[in-house]
Amino acid sequence: MNQWVTSEYKNRISATSVSDASVGKTLFLSGWAFRYRDQGGVIFIDLRDRSGILQIVARKEILGDDFSKVEKIRSEFVIAVKGKLSLRDADSINPKMETGKYELIAESVEILNSSKTPPFTLDEFDPSGEEIRLKYRYLDMRREELRDRLVLRHKLTFALREYLDSKSFLEIETPILNKSTPEGARDFLVPSRLNAGEFYALPQSPQLFKQILMIGGMERYFQIVKCFRDEDLRADRQPEFTQLDMEFSFVTEEDIRREIEAMWAFALKKVFQLEVNAPFMTMPYHVAMEEYGSDKPDIRFGMKLVNVSEHVKSCDFQVFTGAITSGGVVKAICVPGGSVISRKEIEDLTAWLSRDYRAKGLAYMKHGANGLESTITKRFSPEALEAIAKAVGSKEGDMVFFGADSSKIVNASLGALRLKLSEKYDPPKVPYSFHWVVDFPMFEIDETTKSWTFLHHPFTSPKEEDFQKLRDWKDGKEVDLSSIGAKAYDLVLNGTEIGGGSIRIHNPEIQSLVLEAIGIGEEDAKSKFGFLLDALSFGAPPHGGIAFGVDRIMMLLTGGTSIRDVIAFPKTQKGTCMMSEAPGPVEAKQLEELKLRVVTI
């Protein structure tokens, strides 16, 4: 490498920092050769760095012998260029490029490194599959789309830190290696070499430690932290993910929500120039489930679920009356303009809802010139059909779909159908919509074990007015635990839960009762959470908090289809890294040191 290059590093500028004030000045740039065009005696190179692209013009009459170096340059070679900035001729200006009216007339060129031919082109419109892009992630990062998302991710976390620092929050690190505790998903376990037969668990969240920080008097804590869950992966899941974790002392639910709204308003305006109107709408959990079929509803469009049980209870259609007499419900959604949906499409939708949501069928009526029409309308009185149309707000050209079963199945299936059909028939009216879901139940029945479990986590505080119900349950009285409310809240953006939190239990008695209600007795609780239970007895302040999925938020704000789109080195849906080939086997010696043996089951 020529000495002139290293001596110029301190003067290096970025490709997109050029301006009219730079015209005529000698500049030094380095980066990758993106596009290369040889026009005989003149070679045009699009030099790309992290900021963007600037066109380099290499002329033989200016470079002399150095022109032979330029002729050797190929795609993704690393190069350094020194030259004068010039304005392009009017007919060669590229309005699609940020620097499209400038070009650098090269006076010195150096090849800093060569490159193999990339296995895919690095144009943003390249259709290469995700698998090959994950394998060569370092090449994928050079593409504008991924690069911009990673830059925006940095800016967002920086803005969040800036806001929280201004509000007296302390960024405090919590342990990565801890004991395994039940938090709703499987733990990643790490064997201890020094304590043979014992294991650490990677944290699913810093939940216990951030509560202990409040007991320790830190009052306001945050951390942008890696968390780990060994669970089956979907488009919005990764085995390791990033949370913005927060905890406050001496606050109410409303105090926390107002602070969070101000934080997101600040960060989104600063990074995305997005105006957020606060306070956000608040929706009770039961309304979300009854009207949208989801605890994280997308409220940017209509098609609400409407309970029509009262209107159809006297009809002659056994599917509906049977569901009602069995304690279930009949609900409907109106699809604007949906009468064009074909029978084949309806059959496909029915099969999907049956397979994924256990729906027994999908009844439907089209709204024609004379009202609701279908093969089943003869089983309903004219008054009932008119009442249904009025309840769902249908008009000519619309389609009404019905679900008849238990509330749980109907809500889930029609909620999913609502989301699927909205894409075509009732698209969102606004690009972004934030709202809170509140008033969650504290407990629900686990369908697998048929025992009580928590909806959020076992450290969420019940509502004060329900404390006595827990005490009565402990005393053997008949208590429906599902009637106990939780001081919990979720923040939803565009139908995706981006954050969840609660006021925590700071009373040791209530904490023990909650753990006992979900089947964790005194000895078991001491074994799993002894250090927290002990800490609660030393003057724990009232406190609460929230955690946000940074990956998920970035995906929504940048138009990604998966959180893999906004993570530098993501895992596949099988939990593997295509680039490093993790996970992989380890040497026998390492297993021996850990007192472990691999067996085939």
Curated annotation (Swiss-Prot):
Gene Ontology process terms (BP): aspartyl-tRNA aminoacylation
Principal location class: cytoplasm
Reactions the enzyme catalyzes: tRNA(Asp) + L-aspartate + ATP = L-aspartyl-tRNA(Asp) + AMP + diphosphate
Region (Aspartate): 207-210
List of residues binding ATP: R229, D230, E231, Q238, E497, G549, V550, D551, R552
Residue pairs linked by disulfide bridges in the UniProt entry: none
A GO term for molecular function: aspartate-tRNA ligase activity
Transmembrane segments: none
Pfam families, per the entry: GAD (PF02938), tRNA-synt_2 (PF00152), tRNA_anti-codon (PF01336)
Keyword Nucleotide-binding found: yes
Annotated L-aspartate binding sites: E183, R229, H456, R504
Top class in the EC scheme: ligase
Protein localization: Cytoplasm
EC number: 6.1.1.12
InterPro entries in the record: Aa-tRNA-synt_II, aa-tRNA-synth_II, aa-tRNA-synth_II/BPL/LPL, Asp-tRNA-ligase_1, Asp-tRNA-ligase_1_N, Asp/Asn-tRNA-synth_IIb, AspRS_core, GAD-like_sf
Gene3D superfamilies cross-referenced by the UniProt entry: Bira Bifunctional Protein, Domain 2, GAD-like domain, Nucleic acid-binding proteins
Gene Ontology CC: cytoplasm
Keywords of the record: Aminoacyl-tRNA synthetase, ATP-binding, Cytoplasm, Ligase, Nucleotide-binding, Protein biosynthesis
Subunit note: Homodimer.
Protein function: Catalyzes the attachment of L-aspartate to tRNA(Asp) in a two-step reaction: L-aspartate is first activated by ATP to form Asp-AMP and then transferred to the acceptor end of tRNA(Asp).
NCBIfam families: aspS_bact, PRK00476.1
Family: Belongs to the class-II aminoacyl-tRNA synthetase family. Type 1 subfamily.
Protein name, entry field: Aspartate--tRNA ligase
